[in-house]
């Protein structure tokens, strides 16, 4: 339901946007655009979805610290997430000097090769500049058998 909506009504909108972009760049438009939709079991465990939620909240003028804490709580409440790290950088709260702030909850073993870590990067466009958002989620270790 987040991207496509109920009964796939958003799929037609996405197809129209793709054809519009292809017309703009004067590319050859195929007769039929095939769109494969995969359902994500737990959307709150996906780093990309969490980063997009944070960007939306910041663009709605929500304070960045509250946004970071809400994103972390949603992720940790989700099934299978053992740790999360959220970093935001830029002119936070419209300050003169840009800075970087981050929060971490749980474990994020970035140096462990078998760690199942999902990473996403997103930008929030605000009147006083862009804010970069990075999200790491740790879902346990991968074991090849």
Description of each model-found segment:
Residues 1-145:
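RNA-contacting regions in translation and RNA-metabolism proteins
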């Amino acid at each position: 339901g987040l991207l496509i909506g109920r009964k796939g009504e958003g799929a037609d909108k996405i197809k129209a946007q793709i054809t519009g972009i292809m017309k703009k760049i004067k590319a050859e438009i195929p007769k039929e655009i095939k769109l494969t939709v995969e359902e994500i079991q737990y959307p709150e465990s996906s780093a990309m979805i969490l980063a997009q939620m944070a960007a939306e909240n910041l663009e709605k003028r929500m304070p960045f610290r509250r946004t970071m804490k809400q994103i972390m709580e949603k992720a940790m409440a989700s099934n299978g997430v053992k740790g999360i790290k959220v970093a935001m950088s830029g002119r936070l709260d419209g300050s003169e000097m840009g800075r970087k702030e981050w929060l971490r909850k749980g474990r994020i073993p970035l140096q462990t090769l078998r760690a199942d870590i999902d990473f996403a990067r997103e930008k929030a466009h605000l009147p006083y500049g862009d804010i970069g958002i990075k999200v790491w989620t740790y879902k346990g270790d991968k074991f090849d058998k």
